Amino acid sequence: MIKLWHLILIALYTAGFSVMAGEARTVLALGDSITSGGKSFVCYREVLVQELKKRDDGFQFIGPEKDKASAHAGYGGKNTKALLKISEKVFAAYPADIVMIHSGHNSFSKDKPVAGIIRDTEAIIENALAANPEVTILLAQVIPAGKLPKYSYIPELNVELADLASRLSTRGDNIVLVDHADGFDWKTDTVGDKVHPNAAGARKMADKWMAALLALP
């Protein structure tokens, strides 16, 4: 009889574990080359995914692209407007529980791009909400770059991204602002192009994303 109860308890535990394992929250990382990764620099996902696996915290990365780190929706060289054009299709195919957006590079300061980037970012978020009204958006204030004057608009952009997150949160959307600019120094945290993260920079980005993910209810 005792042996039978042991078998029942083991079966219940296994079934419960399987249910919990099946409840992993899906995460879609959307962005440019900083999200997609490359041979000449370190991608934050390489660090983030490994750290989350160590903690067994139940996040599953999804997306149309895939590398050794994870699935994702990162596209090298794409600015926010280009990401907007593909976002509806991506979100329809991969309606994630959580969308991480790091987008704002690949524009030019001389074009005064900030207003357009904000407008396109909001439209991307609307597309994510259309695919999953319960989605949580982790919206990044993007990492600074030393490639100047091209990226001299980034400080202004990050102020406006914070305002966007605040406005959308006020109307009831699940928006979490993730400040990747704070503590990130392009002089020490990027490779020679002064834009893409080195190992130290990728670690800083991964830590910020992980803190935001683990803080979610």
What feature does the model see in each segment?
Residues T26-L28, I34-E122, G146-V159:
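Conserved SGNH/GDSL esterase-like catalytic core that processes O-acyl groups on lipids
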Residues S33, G37, Q50-R55, K89-A93, ...:
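Structured segments of extracytoplasmic/periplasmic soluble domains
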Residues H102-N106, E126-L157, D179-D182:
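Active-site segments of SGNH/GDSL-like serine hydrolases
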Residues M1-W5:
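Positively charged n-region of N-terminal signal peptides that target proteins for export
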Residues E23-V27, R55-Q60, Y94-M100, N132-L138, ...:
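Loop/turn elements at helix/coil->beta-strand transitions in domains of secreted/extracellular proteins
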Residues H6-G16:
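Bacterial N-terminal signal peptides
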Residues P144-P217:
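Catalytic His-Asp segment of secreted/periplasmic serine-dependent ester chemistry enzymes
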